Amino acid sequence: MGILSYLCYSLFYLSIFFIIRLLFQSRKFKNLPPGPTSLPIIGNLHHLKRPLNRTFKALTEKYGNVISLWFGSRLVVVVSSLSEFQECFTKNDVVLANRPRFLSGKYIFYNYTTLGSTSYGEHWRNLRRITSLDVLSNHRINNFAPIRRDETQRLIKKLAEDSSTKFAEVELTFRFFDMTFNNIMRMISGKRYYGDDCDISEVQEASQFRDMVSELLQLSGANNKTDFMPLLKFLDFENLEKRVKRIGEKNDVFLSGLLQEQRSKKERTNTMIDHLLNMQESQPEYYTDTIIKGLCLAMLLAGTDSSAVTLEWTMSNILNYPEVLKKVRDEVDTHVGQDRLVDESDLPKLTYLRNVIYETLRLYTPAPLLLPHSTADECIMGGYKVPRDTIVLINAWAIHRDPETWSEATTFKPERFDKKGELEKMIAFGMGRRACPGEGLALRAISMTLALLVQCFDWKRINDEKIDMSERDGFTMTKLLPLKAMCKTRPVVNKVFK
């Protein structure tokens, strides 16, 4: 009875506090962006129907391109137009270079010390320097080209097993995820986790890590109400904080194991971990174990799911538009032919394929809300005052479908990128100081895979119906239904893989 009374009194006083806070918000924060009326304690959380990018777009159509919402006690501003986005990351770029402090940053991203979770400052500049020089420089990306070539060719061989004489049905979704995971893991540690030549224990280890990532994404952003409502953090009926902490502990065991395994080897190789461990010997203050594990985690989170879903969406579009498939195939055959396989050096010539990828990124942006930003100081957005410590979300999905920015905004039209200036409107990788540093690596891997798939196989849909392009809700926008298709090998497969 005592505990019940305590909870009742706590709820009562917290309710009074939030009601008073709500009444004084309009006085404290003048000239905020418009938005729907918020409720005590929960703010606008009751407005957040899934998926969020579509909900925000609907609210934008009612209140304007810059809107404000209260996620519990935290103010959130959502930007949904290209002009305001560009204002944010030119004039206000430094002000918006911080990240919000969520539970995931504390327990999973090493107490806000990873590249994606840390706020702007000396530590971030150090991480960015390490990433630019030691992880994602052109030299390092070129060094890993044989890995990308090998993984894509393994995919081709696997698909060709049943399709050498006739069309065969193949499942592509999980193959893309396995391939991109192998790509990044081989860059990081030299290990393959999926394939016929892999040890079952390593497959289980990778599956456990993927499950951790899946649970992490489910508990990120608006899904974790304790990040926005102090009362829930205090009560924590759903054990959300404990769950996030447990994920962080499991994640650290996995990454620490990778470092220990590389350290135990007699000879260092060309992997990312080995290179960073070599740097640790001469500059231990910059290349700590925590920083190395954080960089590995950033590569795995940013370089696997996003690339895999982009491959899936792009192949779905290619299959839904036979004329697009024909143009891509003709381009590959013209510049490469059927006597050898596509190489990364051929990619600059495949401009129509590039357009197809960008058009897919436009309509099916892998991270529809990008990564959240936080204001380091008060600033002006779209003529409105935005206070310090406001969470800022960019609805890239809505911006990419804005009819004021794009002609035939919802139509799949790759040739639009032949027009000068269109590519500058793309924001799938962000903009400014906190733009994604892995854009070059991602586009190389995606382009290489798609070029080989079109060069090596004839493709068609399983039936006459178009592939369902519905999306699943989540931080990463995946297809609702896994992608399946029919393929049959072309002559180059027999010539190269005798």
UniProtKB/Swiss-Prot annotation:
Whether Ribonucleoprotein counts among this entry's keywords is no
What broad class of enzyme is this? oxidoreductase
Q: Which reaction does it catalyse?
A: formononetin + reduced [NADPH--hemoprotein reductase] + O2 = 2'-hydroxyformononetin + oxidized [NADPH--hemoprotein reductase] + H2O + H(+)
Stated membrane topology is:
Single-pass membrane protein
- Entry cofactors: heme
Give the residues the record marks as binding heme.
436
Q: Do the record's keywords include Transmembrane?
A: yes
Superkingdom of origin: Eukaryota
- EC assignment: 1.14.14.89
Cellular component, GO, one term: endoplasmic reticulum membrane
GO terms (molecular function) for this protein are: 4'-methoxyisoflavone 2'-hydroxylase activity; heme binding; iron ion binding; oxidoreductase activity, acting on paired donors, with incorporation or reduction of molecular oxygen, NAD(P)H as one donor, and incorporation of one atom of oxygen
Localization recorded for this chain is:
Endoplasmic reticulum membrane
- State which tissues express it: Expressed constitutively in roots, but present at very low levels in uninfected stems and leaves.
Record Pfam families: p450
User: InterPro entries in the record, alphabetically?
Assistant: Cyt_P450, Cyt_P450_CS, Cyt_P450_E_grp-I, Cyt_P450_sf, Plant_Cytochrome_P450_Monoox
Function recorded in the entry? Involved in the biosynthesis of the pterocarpin phytoalexins. Acts on isoflavones with a 4'-methoxy group on the B-ring, such as formononetin and biochanin A, and on pseudobaptigenin. Has a low activity with daidzein and genistein and no activity with the 7-O-methylated isoflavonoids isoformononetin and prunetin.
The text of the family note is: Belongs to the cytochrome P450 family.
Q: What is this protein called?
A: Isoflavone 2'-hydroxylase
Supply the source organism for this entry: Medicago truncatula
